[in-house]
Design a protein with these regions (language model features):
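Catalytic core of membrane glycerolipid acyltransferases/transacylases, capturing the structured
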Residues: 79-100
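Short, hydrophobic/aromatic alpha-helical segments in well-folded domains
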Residues: 84-86, 113-116
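Divalent-metal-activated hydrolytic enzyme cores
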Residues: 1-68, 93-94, 103-112, 119-124, ...
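Short glycine-enriched loops at secondary-structure junctions
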Residues: 76-83, 102-105, 132-135
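Glycine/small-residue-rich phosphate/adenosyl-binding loop
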Residues: 70-72
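Conserved functional hotspot residues or short segments at active or partner-binding sites
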Residues: 129
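Non-catalytic terminal/interface segments that mediate subunit docking, oligomerization
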Residues: 30, 40, 76-77, 87
């Protein structure tokens, strides 16, 4: 990114902002994918970014002078400070209804917020779960699995334990997938812990999407934000692919996804 420039210009009154009201869940996925791709390219070459006032929450308002809330997608993401979700998905104010929690876990309070979006925001066409690489919450769950003595400090902190416990199923699932793909000797690899964090993040993100789609009865997508590439995507049998995927429909589909991803990770 060295040497690249980014110029920001306020456009003022230049007409109405572009219409971003997708008709379907797939249209919403396309908008998120294009926004993610644009963010990934940010800084790679000189870029001029023109901001319409509506992009920051200023624009046509109701009679009371306040914008109506009309997001096209509701997103559950991690609270990691390195992943500002509207920016990473290339979206502006009033385009995403965002719920953030460490580990992007589907606890009752988070699901309640998403239930609100489903019931009261008809503009929402898609629900999405976004995890990210090197997630601290997932790493804590991995360490608790590989080194049970480290769980003792977590066990005495009820709220933190609730988050970590929510991630353990995905960690165990990912660990079994790695052993299936690479054999029992995989645990001796110096890269095993890092690969387990990577795969557990995918497993938990996909599992959360499956759970939410069943819970809400609405289309749900998922993806993992890769910090090194500044892009949301999904790991497949041949590596990381930019772009969201729709939630697995059943346990067989998520098992196939995680097993394929496990085989793509070198140990």
């Amino acid at each position: 990114m060295a040497g690249a420039t980014l110029s920001l210009h306020w456009t003022g009154e230049t007409g109405p902002p572009p219409v971003r009201t997708p008709d379907t869940a797939q249209d919403a996925v396309t908008l998120l994918d294009s926004g993610s791709q644009a963010f990934a390219q940010l800084g790679s070459e000189p870029l001029e970014w023109r901001l319409d006032p509506a992009a920051l929450g200023f624009g046509p308002a109701d009679n009371d002078g306040v914008l109506s809330q009309e997001p096209f997608a509701a997103v559950l993401s991690c609270s990691d400070a390195r992943v500002p979700i509207e920016l990473t998905l290339g979206q502006a104010a009033n385009e995403l209804f965002v719920v953030r929690v460490a580990g992007n876990v589907t606890g009752a309070v988070c699901r309640g917020s998403l239930h609100y979006a489903a019931a009261h925001l008809p503009s929402v066409k898609l629900f999405a779960v976004v995890g990210h690489s090197r997630c601290g919450a997932t790493t804590a769950a991995v360490d608790a699995t590989l080194h049970p003595d480290k769980y003792l400090a977590i066990a005495t902190d009820g709220p933190l334990r609730e988050i970590v416990d929510s991630l353990l199923a995905g960690v165990n699932f990912a660990q079994r997938a790695l052993l299936h793909a690479h054999g029992a000797a995989a645990v001796d690899s110096p890269h095993f812990r890092a690969r387990l964090v990577t795969l557990a993040t995918l497993a938990n993100t996909a599992l959360s999407a499956l759970v939410l789609e069943r819970d809400l009865g609405r289309p749900c997508a998922f993806g993992v934000y890769k910090l090194s590439e500044r892009s949301v995507g999904v790991r497949r049998a041949d590596g990381f692919h930019p772009g969201f995927a729709m939630a697995p429909k059943d346990e067989d589909e998520i098992t196939s996804l995680v097993l394929a991803a496990a085989g793509s990770l070198e140990l």
